[in-house]
Amino acid sequence: MKTIFINRITLAAIAVVFSAFLFTSCQKENSTSGTDALTADQAADFADESTQADASFSDVEDLGMIAAEEDGAASTGRGYHPLFEELRLRTGACANITVTPNDSTYPKTITIDFGDGCLGPDGKFRKGAIIIHLTAPIRQSGAVATITFRNFYLNRAHIEGTKILTNLSSGGNVKFTVQVVNGAVTFPNGRGWQYDELKAVTQIDGGTTPFVRDDVYKIEGRSRTALNGGATLVLNTETPLIKKVVCPWFNNGVLKINANSHVMFVDYGAPNNGDCDNKALLTWNNGANSRLITLP
């Protein structure tokens, strides 16, 4: 059984921040750029890259949560034995995983170092390091995981910023808020995006077992991407995104993307009806136009 506790002060504080973020995002949804009007094709190109930026930070969150969960489950009657078996299924053997201090006490830091880069079993190329600071076991209400980077690349896109996961579980319901501060993604083509998000993550399956692989989460909220010197796009969950830990990508759910007067949708369940794959369908012009997106 995965154990959870309650921290009402933290819950209230995060709720206020989350509400403020949503209010600000709503204000900006209909005026997402101060630059010249975008063409439909430009908006689609930007939506494609914004979706990839969003998915890049989701991948980091995925690895951070898996590492934190396996660390929290590592303490047994015979000592502290983190095996990171599930994490290794994603990163492969090339990542150097260290825990400091290497025992069952907190706070602690987990570092996943990919060195000069390698291709993981999930088909993703990673380089540099992901650093996870934990204040407490991640399943404890009020626990905070702060994720930072050291020269980190995902599929040759440079990822920067700070990602903060806060456990707000109560009454048997496992829930986290996820926030990105000063995020940035620079693609190999040189185009750079600023990125911020605030989302609610709720566990909807797997919570009654000690295993990580059967966990399934529902994600709701907003994110924003701002092209350096250009347009700003707002990404809102039209229908909740569904994420199975066993799959490296979202399985279902729809994002609504606003870019100036253009409204687009990203369907993670299409085109393969929710199968585990790195594809999503971007549509615009009321569905008259579409593009298949390859996710990192």
Residue ranges and their predicted role:
Residues 2-13:
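Bacterial N-terminal signal peptides that target proteins for export
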Residues 14, 27:
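C-terminal, active-site-flanking charged/polar segments
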Residues 21-25:
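C-terminal motif of bacterial Sec signal peptides marking the signal peptidase cleavage site
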Residues 28-296:
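Low-complexity, intrinsically disordered segments exposed to solvent
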